[in-house]
Structure formats: C-alpha cells, structure tokens
C-alpha cells in the first residue's frame, strides 16, 4: 500500500537532510562518514521512489539517486584504494567527560568475521581497573561476529606487590579465554611506550591513553559502573589506520 502524500513528504525531507549532511562531509574530505550518509540517504530516496506515482517526479528522483550512487561508488573506490595503499587515516577526538565511547561502540565497525588474531600493545595493563579494562575488551572480542582465536598482549611488568596482582589477574583471564577456545599470549617489555591495537584484517587503532581512557565511576551503584557507554571519559585521541600487512609483536 502506497504511503500518503504527507508521509512521502516527510520521508523526502528526511532523505534531503541526510544527503545534505553527506555533501557537507564530502566537501570536508571526511569520506568514510560521507559514504555512510550517502548510502543511508540513497536508501531513503529509494523508498520515496517506490511510493511516487507521478512519472515526472519519478524521473527526477531516479536522476538524483543515480547521481548520489555514482558519487558514493567513487568514494568507496577511493577508500578501498587508500586501504590497499595503507594510507587510510581517520581520527576521533574524545572530549573530556564525553560518553558513548565503550569498546563496542569504538571498535565494532572494524571487527568483521575475518578477524581471527588481535595484537595489543599497552604499557598499562597492571592495576586492578586496567586489568578489568582488558577483560572487558576480551569479552567484546568473544561476543562479536569475528572468530578470534589468538590474542597477543605486550605490556610492561608491574613492580613489587603489584606484580603478583598483575600476573595472577592476567593468568586468570588467560585461563578463562582458553575455555572459550581463545589463546592469550602475554609478553612483557620494560621499554614499551606506544599504545596500539591491531586486527589481522588490516585495521590498526591507536588510542592516546590506551584502553585506560574511562574515568573512575562516581560509585559502585552509579550509571556507567557497568555500561561503559554511560561512563565519562578522559580527553584523548583515537587514530585509525588500515594496512593490509599488519606486523606482529
């Protein structure tokens, strides 16, 4: 059953808004975000086309859709080539006290089914809350559609009493992952400074603060204690690259 004229006008207005945003992002060379908006806007215009009866309007819509599809295809080819050449770079700036940046929100678009191996370099997987951060990251990998089988962790060793806590905590995580068919390889370095995460599908994510970018929750029963999307963050920068040939630690 065709939509009413009012419904079509509403859909058309929404499509125009999304495509206007796509053009703005395109002009700013923010191609990855522009592509998403183009694709969403095109889908919306196709729905409008289905409900349009007047031939002249249908012809106009087809012309617009064709133009947007051509531009989206060109952007996709450009991004694919950037990935092929190892030149792709996207930056996300997390503001002080920003929310909505759980590990799942940040990493989900890069964890395709082809991911089977992950490398993590982070010097600060030592204190209790940092061990929990790493555990949450591992939980995300287990839940995602990817079939992760090996996780490599390179971190720095804690000193004194903290060393026992660190080693026992990581060993417990290792045993837990093993029960899910995942091998955790742990290595220590006293000279490690960089923080980066790599997936064997070519994606590499560098976070200024590593996995430790969440603020301490206000209390054990406050929002954000369990759901990291609700947890305020420290200010940091996330740089995302793509390289077909990811190096191993």
From Swiss-Prot:
Gene3D superfamilies: MITD, C-terminal phospholipase D-like domain, Phosphotransferase system, lactose/cellobiose-type IIA subunit
Positions of the MIT domain: 8-86
Membrane topology, as annotated: Peripheral membrane protein
GO MF assignments: identical protein binding; phosphatidylinositol binding; protein domain specific binding
UniProt keyword annotation of Transmembrane present: no
Annotated spans, Important for association with membranes: 168-231
Keywords in alphabetical order: Cell cycle, Cell division, Endosome, Membrane, Transport
Pfam families: MIT, MIT_C
Domain of life: Eukaryota
PANTHER family linked to this entry: MIT DOMAIN-CONTAINING PROTEIN 1
Subunit structure: Homodimer. Interacts (via MIT domain) with CHMP1A, CHMP1B, CHMP2A and IST1.
Domain statement: The C-terminal domain interacts with lipid membranes containing acidic phosphoinositides and is required for location at the midbody.
Cited function: Required for efficient abscission at the end of cytokinesis, together with components of the ESCRT complexes. Seems not to be involved in endosomal transport.
Protein name, entry field: MIT domain-containing protein 1
Organism: Rattus norvegicus
Lineage: Eukaryota, Metazoa, Chordata, Craniata, Vertebrata
Name of the gene this protein is made from: Mitd1
């Amino acid at each position: 059953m065709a939509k009413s004229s009012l419904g079509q006008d509403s859909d058309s207005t929404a499509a125009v808004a999304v495509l206007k945003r796509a053009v703005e992002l395109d002009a700013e060379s923010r191609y990855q975000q522009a592509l998403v908006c183009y694709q969403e806007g095109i889908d919306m215009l196709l729905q409008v086309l289905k409900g349009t009866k007047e031939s002249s309007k249908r012809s106009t819509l087809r012309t617009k859709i064709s133009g947007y599809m051509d531009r989206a295809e060109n952007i996709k080819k450009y991004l694919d080539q950037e990935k092929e050449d190892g030149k792709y770079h996207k930056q996300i700036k997390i503001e002080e006290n920003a929310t909505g940046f759980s590990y799942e929100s940040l990493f989900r678009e890069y964890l395709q089914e082809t991911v089977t191996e992950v490398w993590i370099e982070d010097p600060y997987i030592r204190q209790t809350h940092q061990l929990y951060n790493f555990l949450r990251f591992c939980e995300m990998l287990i839940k995602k559609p990817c079939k992760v089988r090996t996780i490599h962790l390179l971190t720095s060793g804690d000193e004194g009493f903290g060393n026992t806590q660190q080693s026992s905590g990581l060993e417990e995580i290792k045993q837990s992952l093993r029960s899910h068919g995942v091998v955790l390889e742990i290595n220590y370095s006293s000279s490690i400074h960089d923080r980066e995460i790599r997936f064997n599908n070519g994606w590499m994510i560098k976070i200024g603060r590593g996995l430790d970018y969440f603020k301490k929750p206000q209390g054990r029963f406050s929002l954000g204690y369990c759901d990291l999307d609700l947890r305020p963050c420290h200010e940091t920068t996330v740089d995302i690259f793509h390289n077909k040939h990811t190096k191993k630690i």
